[in-house]
Amino acid sequence: MKVLVIPDIHLKPWMFQRAAKIMEQGTAERAVCLMDIPDDWNQEYNINLYVETFDAAIAFAKKYPETLWSFGNHDLCYIWDERESGYSVPAAEIVPKKIEELERALPKGNEIRYVQKIDQVLFCHGGIADDFLRKALPFVKYDDVDEVVSQINGLSREHMWNDISPIWHRPQYAVARMYQPTEILQVVGHTPVKEIYREGNVISCDVFSTY
């Protein structure tokens, strides 16, 4: 299956327009969005851009209902009331409402999750570190990938709002072992990179964000 990965959005509604063209051309059979839909540098007061970007995401979700969505730290910081770089106080009310609207646009059984899985590929915002898994879920069946994904998706803010969680981890800068390094491929965003590349079992694709 050919999958289109839509990396971190950060208030760029045109990314969904470009993704829609790719889908219309039949280049990919399915899409996965790594989210971080809100926030960009010096855009905290541009509420219209927040609305426009979320509306573009919602329209894409309705047009391509099989698209999978993975929460980013910038999405969750509004839900969990955590202040993140670029956090917009003026947008603090509209972002959770728009996320709820996006959730309502998705078909039943296709909820926004921390981790999504297609075949032997895991999609999440930051990446699943082996150390995180063993600390957060010490009794999970390590080799049962479906169970691991299910258990991670059930974790609370307490487990997820830290530097090694799947929404925060940066394997590009860390030497930590990743989950199932020889059996599973992970596709991640979160950390801006100049070009898409693979290192070990991790493909990094956040090429539209800025430092």
Descriptions of predicted regions:
Residues 1-5, 38-43, 155-163:
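Short, basic, glycine/proline-bearing loop/turn elements
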Residues 24-27, 62-63, 117, 177-182, ...:
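Flexible, charged surface loops at secondary-structure boundaries
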Residues 90-108, 112-180:
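Active-site-proximal loop/helix segment associated with metal-binding centers of metalloenzymes
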